[in-house]
A protein has these predicted regions:
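Glycine-centered tight beta-turn/hairpin loop motif at sheet-sheet or coil-to-beta transitions
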Residues: 44-46, 85
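Bacterial N-terminal signal peptides that target proteins for export
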Residues: 1-8
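Chymotrypsin/trypsin-fold serine protease catalytic domain
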Residues: 90, 108-185, 210, 214, ...
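Soluble periplasmic/extracytoplasmic beta-strand elements of cell-envelope proteins
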Residues: 41, 60, 73, 111-115, ...
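Bacterial N-terminal signal peptides
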Residues: 8-16
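Conserved catalytic-core segment of clan PA serine endopeptidases
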Residues: 23-34, 67, 71-122, 129-132, ...
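C-terminal subregion of chymotrypsin/trypsin-like serine protease catalytic domains
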Residues: 32-38, 48, 53-66, 70, ...
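Bacterial Sec-dependent signal peptides at the C-terminal "C-region" and cleavage site
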Residues: 16-24
Length: 238
């Protein structure tokens, strides 16, 4: 491995280590109903994250959202941007983190799949998982639950979305920034939030895991396509 590649890996991992966990999309708009149908809130005693619907009883999220011993549940807001406490739709009865995930290794795949006790209502539909790798310059729609302004101390539960652009794509990771003059992006509740393709059908391409200096960092899902599909199939059969 040459020095250029080693230097790139070092810089990327250093950026991930220094980043904060993603908590909210700052400067974003209320998500439209199409995005709402794919996206779910994940609650715990310590806070909340965002998840993506893979099946009516299967949800994909960030592994760091799962704390051993915590009772997790999924829910959503009342719709139309209403800043209300979410309805609890189901408890989480099983969690499977990526086998290479480690809290001590910031470069490990920050992914987990949840099995729900009760299937989600029909207003939710499974997302289409893309096997295409991300590339620099790709525009993606990011979605997540959390505060919509940096000065908010308590964030109402509203699903928001924003257009972000991939500025770097490297070995299963992507770094994204706002498009144009907008200062929008991930900030401290969006962990596990989806990144959808911008053109055509909203296929799932990435998952938000952290933010730093107005940049959003995400796991590029094409590298983990096989694990996601295999784990989903195993959990769906239980």
């Amino acid at each position: 491995m040459n020095r250029t590649i080693l230097a790139a890996i070092t810089l990327l991992l250093a950026a991930i280590v220094c980043a904060e966990r993603a908590d909210a999309l700052v400067g974003a708009d209320v998500a439209d109903r199409t995005i709402q149908r794919y996206t779910i809130a994940i609650g715990s005693p310590k806070g909340r994250c965002t998840g993506v619907v893979l099946a009516q009883n299967i949800v994909l999220t960030a592994a760091h959202c799962i704390v051993p011993g915590d009772k997790l549940w999924v829910g959503d807001h009342a719709g139309g941007g209403s800043p209300t406490i979410p309805s609890r739709l189901s408890a989480v009865v099983e969690t499977v983190s990526h086998p290479l995930w480690s809290r001590k290794d910031a470069g490990s795949p920050d992914l987990a799949i949840l099995r729900l006790a009760t299937p989600l209502p029909d207003r939710f539909i499974p997302v289409t998982l893309s096997s295409r790798h991300l590339a620099e310059g790709d525009n993606l729609i990011a979605a997540g639950y959390g505060k919509g302004a940096a000065e908010e101390t308590r964030s109402p539960l509203v699903l928001r979305m924003v257009l972000l652009r991939v500025t770097r794509a490297f070995r299963g990771w992507a770094i994204l920034a706002s498009v144009g003059e907008d200062r929008a992006g991930g900030a401290p509740g969006d962990s596990g939030g989806p990144l959808f393709s911008y053109r055509g059908m909203h296929s799932l391409m990435g998952l938000i895991v952290s933010i730093s200096d107005r940049q959003t960092r995400a796991v590029a899902l094409a590298a983990h396509y096989g694990w996601i599909k295999e784990t989903q199939a195993k959990l769906s059969g239980r």
